[in-house]
Amino acid sequence: MSRHDELIRLRHMRDFTAEAIAISNGKERDDLTTDRLLELALIRLMEVIGEAAGRISSDTRAQLPDIPWSDVVAMRNRLIHGYDSVDHDILWDTITHDLPPLLRAVDQLIQQLSEE
């Protein structure tokens, strides 16, 4: 995979992660139960983040071993294949606690790769 393709996928991860964080700001966990559009939007964003992560090469992943790459991809798989039993507590916890550091790490990796 070319450096250009890697950067595109990392930018997708960054942009969709930032969007999930922005959409969840000012919301609470219970809103996932009462706001169907919020639920669907956040699930879709998490699916795309995981899909993009799954397309990042192992060489690029190795540059930031602090990112739990396999967990990001596993979340995508769980949401896609377990579409009928999404655990809102896990989804909310992931978005509110795990995405902000993921955003910073991916942004850092994009900057590193852009400078090389």
What do these predicted ranges mean?
Residues 1-116:
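Solvent-exposed interaction patches of small proteins and small membrane subunits
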